[in-house]
Amino acid sequence: MIQGDGVEYDKLAEWVKTLPIYSESPSQILTCEIGVREGLGSKVIMDEITARLPGVPYKHIAIDPYGDLLYQHYDKDTPGKPDFPVRGDYTDSMMKQMIHDFSRYPEFKFHNMTDTEFMNKHPDLGPFDFVHFDGPHMTKDVLTESIWFANRSRRGTRFVFDDYTYYSMDQVAYCLTYFGFKTIEAGENKICLERKK
């Protein structure tokens, strides 16, 4: 059974369900999740898209390096969080279970790499319709990801950020206004921005 370690998956489902599609018959839908872990976020996104748009060519990209990486998870001034590199518990057995769980999802494309490796390896992908940012929680990393994906978005694209109170979301949202993104709703843990133009 596909599980998750976060909260507000109901909000994630609602934001996918109400994703604006500005074409009667879109030629393709492309979604992404950075930081897959056990996979519930990706499952919610794919289930909502396939239920809403059956028959439309669809691909969901899942990015996660797994492997118990040692890295700094949070900004230095994040209250209650370590400001030094720590080892995550993203084990190879967790990855194998996730791959097995998604074997029934033909639209699921797993990229076993970091966000930076993915962005460098796939500069021509897009446009993305929905991105769930649940990977690194440092402001500089979230900004880098956001700008990369914003350059590969279109009108109606939605970005959802998990654990947004752990980094400078105000800076991220401000930078995304350049691309036409506006905040449409904020929960306690997740926030959704939509490209309006």
For the regions a language model picked out, list residue spans one by one.
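S-adenosyl-L-methionine
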Residues: 1
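Phosphate/oxyanion-binding active-site loops and adjacent basic polyanion-contact surfaces
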Residues: 4-8
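S-adenosylmethionine/decaboxylated-SAM
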Residues: 9-197
